Amino acid sequence: EDEDANCGIMLKVARKCYLPMNALLLKLIRKYDGRFKVSFSISGTALDQFEAYAPEVIQSFRELVATGCVELLSETYNHSLAFLYSPEEFREQVALHDERIEALFGVTPRVFRNTELIYNNDLARAVEAMGYKAVLAEGADHVLGWRSPNFVYRPAGCDRLKLLLKNYRLSDDIAFRFSNHQWPEFPLTADKFSEWAHAANASGDLINLFMDYETFGEHQWESTGIFAFMEALPEVMLRTPGF
């Protein structure tokens, strides 16, 4: 393992993404007095890297969690696909991850996110048996068919577990298309995105936006306007009562 490379990459991404975006989210949470909330799924491996090379990132996440407006999700410690190979190993990794979250942040995850949103109904039943109240999954067209990802579902064979699906179109508009000058909708503004989100949610329960955190500052550099976009987005989204 190349410790120097690990350290260099972590410091670069912390400087470009984690620290400035966490600071922005903290500012927005305080500004909107509890109306703006976010969730994070942080693997144990990432937490290990933060502690080793950029402990200030851990502290910035602690400040966010302390607001009561940030939820930390459960996942496998090593961001692995253990469930597909060994249910026992899967349970051990998830328990280890939750213990780490509790030790660092003083909260117990209640919602599960499998690596890369990989999902099947067997996973859902296992997650329900482990005591979680919801599981996240990809809102894949070939699975949904005519259905919309903008509703809360209950997985087959589960009694209580809620299934929350990613709206990949709206998520990818930010994560992948935001700075693409060839995209017909470029530039993406907060007002434009808000219109799309409200239109998509006209007959739905919710809209789940899931994306890599490195979207902000690393994949989409600060010079693209991604931070300014995110700073403006809550205000225009929250203009609609009840949203």
Q: Residue locations for each model-derived region?
A:
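Polyanion-engaging groove/track-forming segments
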Residues: 207-220, 224
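Catalytic alpha-helical scaffold of carbohydrate-active enzymes acting on polysaccharides/glycoconjugates
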Residues: 1-111, 117-173, 179, 187-204, ...
